A protein has these predicted regions:
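Histidine-centered, transition-metal-coordinating active-site segments
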Residues: 1-80, 84-90, 97-99, 119, ...
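Short coil/turn segments at secondary-structure boundaries
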Residues: 67-78, 91-92, 107-114, 127-130
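Aspartate-rich (DDxxD/NDxxD/DxxxD) Mg2+/diphosphate-binding motifs
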Residues: 100-129, 135-136
Length: 382
């Protein structure tokens, strides 16, 4: 039996919860185009994101540790893949559209500049008087304008729901700005669970990378209630955590967070009588959530990571280096645009110098930014 697009949509209609986003009900694309024979609209979107230059570049962009620090630390790409996996698990358990959750997860960090959140803060400061910079908006700009792969239009021509999910991405570190995407309404539940999948992924893998790097000591974990309780349940001695024990611990922490979100979200859906996508959109607060207790524990964990990992002197030095590199590059490009590659110079004529420089720098990998700095400022650079 062949699973055509029509067959896939029919199976989706039967299998999904009444409040899920069905691909058959999408608001469609900005530019009309033929449907795929064997893919739903959201599956087609996922494949388009996967093949972008911006997605490939995530491999060499910082999560916490700069790419050259080691091959085994998470990058922005491995983080994205982990978010997509968690999002699919949450969507499957809640009867939601896995394909929509996956593509929003895959696209949510496309607009991140080099050097992680430090790079974003620097670009936001540099662009404050020139239209600003926000990585969610930059992700949307990439998929609607900067990627050029089709003769009839710029961008990827993704469905409305995927674009909405990108621009309304929201975590404790990301605040959405969705002027053109019904900002008064909540996004789909699929997009909401991506927000939590993002938090779940970085809570677990930043903790893992912090321990692996030695910047966090296993004994410090006892300061955090949820970690202390989990270690007791697993009968692990946090003062003597072996490499194998660490892997078990992180895996169980991931499972704990995912299970809690499924149970808490399902409970509020039932309690509030959510029976349609419209109910999801009009609900005053996000439906996807942790339980109250675990939510408080996750806030404590985030505070612990901020104080002990993100503000560790080793990471602070990386941040200072990133700030210096990006500020000097921005200054050089804007004061002497002739330094820019021809394509960027053309973009500057069309869209303005500062926006073109911002797009160029936001698209850089950590390695490219450092190499570019050396080419411009190292007297022996080539």
């Amino acid at each position: 039996m062949r699973y055509t697009r029509e067959r896939l949509l029919e199976l989706e209609d039967r299998a999904l919860a009444p409040y899920a986003m069905r691909a058959s009900e999408t608001r469609g694309r900005e530019h009309p185009e033929p449907e795929s024979a064997y893919r739903t609209p959201f599956q087609k979107d996922r494949d388009r994101v996967l093949h972008t230059t911006a997605f490939r570049r995530l491999e060499y962009k910082t999560q916490v540790f700069v790419n050259y620090e080691g091959d085994y630390y998470r990058t922005r790409l491995t983080h994205t893949l982990e978010v997509a996996q968690v999002a699919r698990s949450l969507a499957r358990a809640l009867g939601l559209n896995e394909d929509l959750a996956e593509v929003v997860a895959m696209a949510h960090d496309l607009g991140h500049p080099p050097f992680g959140h430090a790079g974003e803060r620097v670009l936001a400061e540099l662009m404050e008087a020139h239209g600003g910079f926000d990585h969610n908006k930059q992700s949307l700009r990439i998929v609607t304008w900067l990627e050029r792969r089709y003769p009839g239009f710029r961008g990827l021509n993704l469905t409305w729901e995927v674009r909405e999910g990108i621009v309304k991405h929201e975590t404790v570190y990301d605040l959405p700005s969705a002027e053109d995407y019904e900002p008064q309404l909540r996004p789909t539940l699929e997009a909401q669970i991506v927000n939590l999948a993002d938090e779940i992924a970085y809570n677990a893998h930043d903790l893992d990378d912090g321990l692996r790097s030695g910047l966090l000591r296993p004994g410090q974990l006892a300061q955090v209630e949820v970690l202390r309780e989990l270690a007791a349940e697993l009968e692990l001695d946090l003062e003597r955590l072996s490499e194998f024990d660490r892997r078990v611990f992180i895996r169980e922490l991931l499972g704990l967070m995912i299970t809690d979100v499924v149970a808490a979200t399902d409970a509020v859906i039932a309690a509030e009588g959510i029976g349609s996508l419209d109910d999801v959109r009009r609900f005053p607060v996000p439906l996807a959530r942790y339980s109250e207790r675990l939510g408080a524990q996750m806030a404590e964990l985030r505070g612990f990571l901020y104080a002990n990992l993100y503000r560790h002197y080793h990471i602070v030095r990386q941040v200072a280096k990133a700030k210096h590199v990006l500020e000097r590059l921005f200054e050089a490009y804007t004061q002497m645009p002739e330094m820019l590659p021809p394509g960027v110079q053309t973009a500057a004529e069309e869209e303005g110098l500062f926006r073109a420089v911002c797009d160029y720098m936001a698209g850089m990998t950590d390695r490219y930014a450092l190499d570019e700095y050396a080419r411009i400022f190292d007297p022996y650079g080539r």
